[in-house]
Amino acid sequence: MKVRSSVKQICDKCRVIRRKGRVMIICVTPKHKQRQG
């Protein structure tokens, strides 16, 4: 899980979701998991 101020989709499988007011990227590639913070 990478914590970044700006989250971007890295590949086609990356999806942007909002959880508890936080913007997150979920993907089939674990390396692509990101959270805004």
Swiss-Prot record:
<dbReference type="InterPro" id="IPR000473">
    <property type="entry name" value="Ribosomal_bL36"/>
</dbReference>
<keyword id="KW-0687">Ribonucleoprotein</keyword>
<protein>
    <recommendedName>
        <fullName>Large ribosomal subunit protein bL36</fullName>
    </recommendedName>
</protein>
<dbReference type="GO" id="GO:0005840">
    <property type="term" value="C:ribosome"/>
</dbReference>
<dbReference type="GO" id="GO:1990904">
    <property type="term" value="C:ribonucleoprotein complex"/>
</dbReference>
<dbReference type="GO" id="GO:0003735">
    <property type="term" value="F:structural constituent of ribosome"/>
</dbReference>
<dbReference type="Pfam" id="PF00444">
    <property type="entry name" value="Ribosomal_L36"/>
</dbReference>
<comment type="similarity">
    <text>Belongs to the bacterial ribosomal protein bL36 family.</text>
</comment>
<dbReference type="InterPro" id="IPR035977">
    <property type="entry name" value="Ribosomal_bL36_sp"/>
</dbReference>
<keyword id="KW-0689">Ribosomal protein</keyword>
<dbReference type="GO" id="GO:0006412">
    <property type="term" value="P:translation"/>
</dbReference>
<dbReference type="GO" id="GO:0005737">
    <property type="term" value="C:cytoplasm"/>
</dbReference>
